[in-house]
Amino acid sequence: NSIFMRLSGYARGALVGRAHNVVRHPDMPAGLYRCVWDDITAGDAVSAYITNRSSDGGRYRVFATIVPSGAGFLSVRTLPMRTDLRDAVEAVYARVRQVETASDAAGASRREAAAAGQAALLEELQALGYRDSVDFTRRTLPDEVAALVAAGVGIPARDGDGPLARVLAEMNGVEVATADLVALLDECSRMVALLGRRSDEIGSLSARLKRLRDCLREAFADVERYGEVDGLILECVEQLHPLAGQVAELRSDVDSVRFGIALLRLHNLASGFFALQIIDGEDELDANDAVGSLRELTRALRDGAERLTERLALYHARGELVGGELDDVAEALTAIDRPLLDLLGSVPDAGADDEAAVSSVRLARSLVRDGFPEARHLADLAGAVRDLEVPYAAADIDARLVLVEAALAELA
């Protein structure tokens, strides 16, 4: 489109039908493109900070998001907003390029050098706190979209008649319908962080309860004396065993919802701005299949809307399940507190014949000195999971996309 031509410095005829290599900058590592290709061919969306080369040998930076679309792929590029992260990633690229250059010098083939670069890039991403390139996309796209919205980027309105005007009006309508969704990006981010902390806390709590059971067995020779308390602790341990994994899965669900919201808004913005460029005469309707491009953007928007519906259904189902489990564990922990303190208080601190037993009791007391604050944490988490409401007007968005598709059919 006109923006791509302006940034790259190429005329339309010099770009149509050409491979992306025409704007590839030598600073970009081959390992990145290998990661991109692996991810999109696996059906995943990909986001990356990319530096392109313009026709005069200069450079321009973009934040690219690529998704599978039909038999091919759809790429949307925006101005990088997280400049701190962009700079950190560009430093990573420079180090990865050094690995690839060293591989070249050692006689590696281009494919082998790219593989070495890909491995180095994935290690670098892990050092930045990302599991892999898919995790980078899942977390970075929402941040970039949230920053765009915070900067006031939105689809301008235009008065007018005709199919393109209707496309723009409906894309404005989708933007309005998803405004509350976009406002949830930060809330979802906080929920993801909270679920991560609680998942770690559950693991630590489980280990503490197991150690507590060991202490009771070492302190009391008579099983009947501690058996009731031990049974309560065992019940908690068994409830906690699957819960850490369930909370981690719920965290992934929230992450997925957050990503789905961001992708929906990205394709909404791209569709609206492309329609606007044609209306304003910046792009020609018949040039480079503009209608086909709008149709593909609309299809991506519809696919994203449908996937978000699926993501939300999964989150709500798992949230209800995990919320109930969290409540159960919180109640079980609260039920342990008094009987456990009574049991430990029945053993004198000194004077007993069995010093080993006294030592075990002291250790047990240290393990429960502050009680089980995790009970409150887990109960609060259950409430937070249930209280996360996602105002998604799926039917309204679908109806607007039907009108967009009808308008595009008139232009075909």
Model-predicted regions and their roles:
Residues 1-99, 174, 181, 188, ...:
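Sensory/regulatory domains in signal-transduction proteins
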Residues 123-234, 238:
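Charged heptad-repeat coiled-coil "rod" segments that mediate homo-/hetero-oligomerization
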Residues 107-114, 118, 130, 160, ...:
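Intrinsic-disorder-associated interaction segments
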Residues 70-153:
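Sensory coupling linkers of modular signal transduction proteins
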